């Protein structure tokens, strides 16, 4: 896969548009006057001054690819308890870099976003790749489905839906939709596939002072992570000032009880510590059938420096040790793409011309409404890259072996590709 150097996403960058002051006069005053307390913001067309210069699909890609290489260590960790710690570390890395001070664009129905990252392999002898494919599969409610596949055979699948409600000078953000991570783990001479379910892609949050004062975000939720294959689970609680605490448990089949095996606490913006506890039986020891000779051989394997920030016996995550990946973008060939459709809106927001951005965005929204009335596209249960599973009630990624073209009445122009409200 080759990168197109001309393509860039502002979801990977920081700029003054993130903290730009909002004037309460003009279009903003008119917009606020139309809102009621508790109103759902994903169903209204928001002025560009409230928007980040990128789509929700771009945000999902940036968030989940930036530290995807952290998961590679789980393949080489023989202790199931510490494998769970690696999953938690990766989840924290996805949360910590979030920015909810403004809202990304609602993705267009049928909008596609593709990108990838390259990083050193675990032993540093080659280069690995992780590819992201995301698609907006429904419009009401707005639902995003995406898949990440790595060279090592790790996959990440997610159906995620965000809702944001207005509360005068604050906005509450609620996330629904689980994340499924599948990892082929090397245990001795065997490869065992483990599946981890994170019950929410992000914790719920409260964004304060969205109009007056200094904007800040407070996480207000707990998240559960489960792995039936290794009989491990974790519950993580989020609090203000990015403080987290939680515990990791292992189900002891010998005693038929769930044992509390580790506690964690700290700040996801700095350091999160972990404290491992002793098991009540020998059964919960590391799930390894490798001989001492094999273990010594494994220890001698030189890790690449990018993979040396795995959780230690006392530190779950030290943000100063994390090395982010740089996102690359292939040539965009799909009819509706995040980087193509919103290009001019993004350009005007970054330049600070909100009037021009609002006008272009309105044209996009108007064209989308016309298209949906004609095509009835919202009723479809199959998109270009995802298909709805009625039994599981989720949108599933069509693997590269089964991808088939789906008739799409949408024009390749940005206006015909337009979505509803943002």
Swiss-Prot record:
GO terms, molecular function: sterol binding
UniProt region (Disordered), positions on chain: 283-313, 402-422
Pfam families, sorted: Oxysterol_BP
Comp. bias regions, Low complexity: 407-422
Basic residues compositional bias, start-end: 293-307
SUPFAM superfamilies: Oxysterol-binding protein-like (SSF144000)
Coiled-coil residue spans: 354-384
GO CC annotations on file: cytosol; membrane; nucleus
Coiled coil listed as a keyword: yes
Keywords: Coiled coil
Family: Belongs to the OSBP family.
Protein name: Oxysterol-binding protein 7
Source organism of the structure: Dictyostelium discoideum (Social amoeba)
């Amino acid at each position: 896969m080759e990168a197109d150097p001309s393509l860039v996403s502002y979801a990977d960058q920081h700029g003054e548009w993130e903290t730009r002051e909002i004037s309460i006069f003009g279009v903003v005053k008119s917009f606020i006057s139309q809102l009621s307390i508790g109103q759902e913001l994903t169903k209204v067309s928001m002025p560009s001054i409230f928007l980040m210069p990128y789509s929700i699909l771009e945000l999902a890609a940036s968030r989940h690819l930036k530290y995807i290489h952290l998961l590679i260590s789980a393949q080489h960790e023989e202790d199931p308890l510490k494998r769970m710690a690696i999953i938690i570390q990766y989840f924290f890395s996805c949360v910590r870099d979030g920015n909810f001070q403004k809202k990304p664009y609602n993705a267009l129905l049928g909008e596609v976003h593709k990108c990838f990252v390259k990083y050193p392999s675990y032993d540093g002898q080659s280069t690995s790749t992780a590819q992201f494919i995301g698609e907006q599969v429904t419009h009401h409610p707005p639902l995003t489905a995406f898949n990440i596949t790595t060279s090592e055979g790790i996959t990440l699948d997610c159906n995620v839906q965000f809702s944001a409600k207005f509360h005068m000078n604050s906005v509450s953000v609620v996330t629904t939709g689980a994340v499924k991570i599948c990892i082929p783990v090397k245990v001795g001479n065997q490869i065992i596939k483990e599946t981890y379910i994170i019950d929410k892609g992000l914790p719920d949050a409260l964004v304060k002072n969205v109009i007056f004062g200094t904007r800040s975000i407070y996480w207000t939720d707990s998240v559960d992570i489960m792995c039936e294959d290794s009989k491990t689970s974790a519950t993580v609680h989020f609090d203000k000032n990015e403080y987290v605490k939680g515990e990791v448990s292992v189900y002891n089949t010998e005693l038929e009880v769930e044992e509390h095996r580790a506690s964690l606490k700290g700040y996801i913006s700095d350091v999160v510590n972990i404290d491992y506890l002793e098991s009540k039986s020998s059964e919960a020891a590391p799930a390894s059938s490798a001989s001492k000779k094999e273990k010594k051989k494994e220890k001698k394997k030189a890790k690449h420096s990018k993979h040396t920030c795995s959780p230690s016996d006392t530190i779950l995550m030290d943000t100063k040790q994390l090395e982010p990946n740089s996102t690359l973008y292939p040539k965009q060939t799909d009819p509706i793409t995040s980087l193509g459709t919103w290009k001019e809106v993004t350009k005007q927001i970054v330049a600070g011309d909100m009037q021009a951005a609002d006008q272009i965005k309105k044209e996009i929204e108007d064209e989308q409404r016309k298209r949906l009335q004609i095509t009835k596209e919202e009723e479809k249960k199959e998109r270009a890259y995802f298909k709805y599973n009625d039994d599981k009630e989720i949108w599933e990624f069509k693997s590269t072996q089964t991808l088939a073209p789906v008739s799409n009445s949408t024009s390749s122009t940005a206006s015909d590709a337009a979505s509803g409200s943002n």
